[in-house]
Amino acid sequence: MAAATMALSSPALAGKAAAKVFGEGRITMRKSAAKPKPAASGSPWYGADRVLYLGPLSGEPPSYLTGEFPGDYGWDTAGLSADPETFAKNRELEVIHSRWAMLGALGCVFPELLARNGVKFGEAVWFKAGSQIFSEGGLDYLGNPSLIHAQSILAIWAVQVVLMGAVEGYRIAGGPLGEVVDPLYPGGSFDPLGLADDPEAFAELKVKEIKNGRLAMFSMFGFFVQAIVTGKGPLENLADHLADPVNNNAWAYATNFVPGK
């Protein structure tokens, strides 16, 4: 699902002219990615004096990492950001994947948390919940048959592609008239709380988003590994570890794991 949506997230439209014809007149609009507004000079997250990946022990950052964008700690050992076009593409992919990962991590943990506190709504373990659609009775959203009773995986896939693709297409295209300049931070209807109204606060929120997003991507990777190795959800694994940390830890599972058992 994420792959289908990410296919719609390409920045290839940025910088290209879009022409619309009304009657005999022609209106041409050009959308280009906006350069971020400079953060406050005292911000520790931007500029040449920003915090680097190893603090005072960090070496000189590459010349192309200037601290202009959020999450730039001056570390690029593989030189992945040396090419400006590649950097722009990877930056967009990272932000989008970060947002997906934050939503996914919450979705993995929250149902288990509710179930462990007495809330009954069907299967709570994230990697088992979706498989209920293949059962004879199908899948009830939140365990309630009066909400959405799903019986076709193809129907769910089609609905998600249409709805999520429409939102992503709207974001990338800059709205119906191309008025949104930066597809990564479109604002407007995507910012109903007005969090981007203050430029300095918005610059700091961008840093918080990318930092939490990177942690969430690592978390999701850990959840996948746990599901394969233990066959349990993240909270159940945490409870097992706290109850018996000697026998329930990464090292113990890594040295005793046998695929298929």
Curated annotation (Swiss-Prot):
It is found in: Plastid, Chloroplast thylakoid membrane. Chlorophyll b 5 binds at Q160, F257. GO terms for molecular function: chlorophyll binding; metal ion binding. Residues 1-29 form a transit peptide. Binds at least 14 chlorophylls (8 Chl-a and 6 Chl-b) and carotenoids such as lutein and neoxanthin. Chlorophyll a 4 binds at N212. Chlorophyll b 2 binds at R99, I148, L177. It holds the Pfam family Chloroa_b-bind. Photoregulated by reversible phosphorylation of its threonine residues. GO terms for biological process: photosynthesis; photosynthesis, light harvesting in photosystem I; response to light stimulus. The N-terminus of the protein extends into the stroma where it is involved with adhesion of granal membranes and post-translational modifications; both are believed to mediate the distribution of excitation energy between photosystems I and II. PANTHER family: CHLOROPHYLL A/B BINDING PROTEIN. This is Chlorophyll a-b binding protein 2, chloroplastic. The gene is CAB2R.
